[in-house]
């Protein structure tokens, strides 16, 4: 009887494991011999692969994809926004391009406050006053001119064709458009005339044509940055600003320049991480968390064990305090990078973490002791020579500020919301930030975008990044930990359920199946608080050499791509 009972228990355990494995099963990563492109929109992925096939390098492909996404992924792909590009060249050189939007010269620290000093709801997220000076065109052209091999005309041509002739919408495309139907209905003369079909929401199988955007892209193709920052497009942008209550002028456009910076770098268990420096907080926070976790036996503790999750949550909590307190535009703020990236500092944080008691966010301050919108897009590319590019760029919210530079087809960002409108008041992503990120003329707002490249022995092994507002950092981090600490293959690491802690609010957001019920109970007994998932990220990742770190290649394939299934428009594609 005893043996029978044991056998039944064993069978029940086996069945539950089998059911879990069926639920959690991932497809194999996409393999290719000569190069790989992973983007959030399948047509853009194909554009990138065609550039690689024609002899272009990873930077050429990144530029072509950037322009193509402005057409086929208008919710976040853009030429009216900005972003970051991390580059690791095959010869070992690495660099970072900052084409983040800037505050207009007329911007002031209190521009979104009423007479009583309270934040005016929606002022920094909707309308022309919410728009920062766009940087995407400057960034793409800087990258192409310095690191690319193809002509501007060759790289913009696919985007022009897609805008001029249109492309057939699939379900994922219309799902994205439907998120802003009410906004388009309010702006029927401009965005509504483009992103609705004769006044009705688009349906799958219908064709989206963007003639004004095609004309703008032709001007950029012919004149480079002058096709956007001067002349017809600039005149229409400035006129739209003036008519709509915005403050961007021609002087703002004239002064915009892409910055080339040294990336943030750190080491984790034998791998070298190359990521985004300020005005991104991404690389700093990822490295700070990794430095903390490196002192714990994460592999031995096991994937999403109570102890491992507890340590990770607490590391996130402490690192986000520093993010929100210290970091800002390096032209205006002295960012204490050496201190935040110091492994001795990480050791002090570990000493402050109670192994079985959650920290209380409101009591954690920057330093020790005590501790001193999803709505973006990311793509990853590696070419046959090993050049790697990781790009995250954005309009901030879906479809940005919900306004256009009229007559240009260009949707404009609402990036001003990423500044601190008022110390202690959260932005759209719930981030509470400090004076270091205050609004000021010509300043670039702090960002969470984290385009990241991981190397070993000087060669690229991983390219990874995601959209998702403040969740970008933790989603990128967890994907890397899943491979480095837990031995997952690339697609498993991307698919795995995630959790997110950003200091404030107190609760940690968890996706379905991220924690088993008993693990969650243990963590709650230690004082951890949990809330449901936030909007999904979309990881776009590439591994070089094998489907998993330290694994064996499949056939002749050298490149392996993983597209996040959480959004249904993307594609990993190689050749």
From Swiss-Prot:
Signal peptide (from-to): 1-24
MF terms in GO: glutathione hydrolase activity; leukotriene C4 gamma-glutamyl transferase activity
GO BP annotation list: glutathione biosynthetic process; glutathione catabolic process; proteolysis
Taxonomy, superkingdom: Bacteria
EC number from the UniProt entry: 3.4.19.13, 2.3.2.2
Keyword Hydrolase assigned: yes
Residues annotated to bind L-glutamate: 100, 394, 396, 415, 418, 447-448, 468-469
Pathway participation: Sulfur metabolism; glutathione metabolism
Cited InterPro entries: GGT_bact (IPR051792), GGT_CS (IPR055262), GGT_lsub_C (IPR043138), GGT_peptidase (IPR000101), GGT_ssub (IPR043137), Ntn_hydrolases_N (IPR029055)
Catalytic residue list: 376 (nucleophile)
Major location category of this protein: periplasm
Keyword DNA-binding: no
Reaction equations catalysed: an N-terminal (5-L-glutamyl)-[peptide] + an alpha-amino acid = 5-L-glutamyl amino acid + an N-terminal L-alpha-aminoacyl-[peptide]; glutathione + H2O = L-cysteinylglycine + L-glutamate; an S-substituted glutathione + H2O = an S-substituted L-cysteinylglycine + L-glutamate
SUPFAM superfamilies, alphabetized: N-terminal nucleophile aminohydrolases (Ntn hydrolases)
GO CC, alphabetical: periplasmic space
Compartments where located: Periplasm
Keywords: Acyltransferase, Glutathione biosynthesis, Hydrolase, Periplasm, Protease, Signal, Transferase, Zymogen
PROSITE patterns: G_GLU_TRANSPEPTIDASE
PTM section of the record: Cleaved by autocatalysis into a large and a small subunit.
Pfam family, one: G_glu_transpept
PANTHER family according to UniProt: GLUTATHIONE HYDROLASE, GLUTATHIONE HYDROLASE PROENZYME
Quaternary structure (record): This enzyme consists of two polypeptide chains, which are synthesized in precursor form from a single polypeptide.
Protein family: Belongs to the gamma-glutamyltransferase family.
Name of the featured protein: Glutathione hydrolase proenzyme
Species per Swiss-Prot/TrEMBL record: Pseudomonas sp. (strain A14)
